[in-house]
Amino acid sequence: MLIISNLSATIEDKKILKNFGLEIKPGEVHAIMGPNGSGKSTLANVLSGKKGYKIDGKAFYEGTDLLEIPIEERAKKGIFLAFQYPIEIPGVNTNNFLKTSLNAIRKHRGLKELDSLEFL
């Protein structure tokens, strides 16, 4: 499902990730843990497509090299960052926002979109 091999990431001449590797098979759950500055956020940023990093290595998700596809395509595959405490957007209902996001991913995967009752 997710295979990362020899992933290195550098920003502003500082190497953060050095030959990182990880394999997550379908059904497995993993936690990325470590002290401040160990590269957890950098890993998430690189996988989700944040710009500004010099990247070497490979990161395959469901057979697709994430590092070769645009941010929008990564998000459609479900690879994106979300804020733990998102800001409120006036006039935007949180449930509707989440349903729209989920349905965009479902549509990309060829699945039927959920109506409001199915979503809840």
Which residue stretches match the model-derived regions?
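Conserved structural motif at the start of ABC-family nucleotide-binding domains
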Residues: 2-4, 17-19
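The feature captures the beta-strand-to-loop junction immediately N-terminal to the Walker
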Residues: 33-35
